[in-house]
């Protein structure tokens, strides 16, 4: 069953419009009204808003750029490690950082902190660093969707010296 990250509170019985990226993915998979998907949204800041785990959902409406789902039963699934692992890593070359974020998210790392060290190959200006953090966030979300993790390491910090 396809899994999608949904950055909104999830409650059983609610109707929800999927975010643009997830909606496009549902359309590419050629899902139809009545098909089932799995939603998750848990990351730091969601404690008390939505319970951790997964929600079954059923596609109810397919539009040109809109997909609406009805949220079903909650399943309290915890696939992450018992202890929080925080990863601090010196900035490698560009593609390697993408790979590192992907694998760290698959392993269940709680947070990733890039470090600008004396020998770092990659140097980022403030504006470019913000764009990179957003990109790494989307890489982490994709990795969690694929591997079955329910906690996205959204605490990807800005690079520190």
Feature locations, PLM:
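RNA substrate-binding interface of SAM-dependent RNA methyltransferases
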Residues: 72, 76-158
């Amino acid at each position: 069953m396809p899994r999608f990250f949904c950055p909104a509170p999830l409650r059983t019985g609610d109707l929800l419009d999927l975010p643009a990226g997830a909606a496009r993915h549902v359309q590419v998979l050629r899902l139809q009204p009545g098909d089932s998907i799995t939603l998750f949204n848990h990351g730091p800041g969601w404690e008390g808003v939505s319970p951790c785990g997964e929600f079954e959902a059923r596609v109810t409406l397919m539009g040109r750029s809109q997909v609406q789902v009805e949220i079903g039963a909650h399943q309290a699934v915890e696939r992450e490690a018992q202890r929080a692992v925080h990863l601090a890593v010196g900035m490698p070359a560009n593609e390697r950082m993408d790979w590192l974020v992907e694998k760290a998210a698959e392993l269940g790392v709680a947070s990733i902190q890039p470090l600008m060290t004396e020998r770092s190959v990659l140097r980022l200006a403030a504006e470019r660093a913000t764009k990179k953090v957003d990109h790494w966030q989307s890489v982490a979300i994709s990795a969690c969707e694929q591997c079955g993790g329910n906690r996205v390491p959204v605490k990807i910090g800005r690079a520190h010296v």
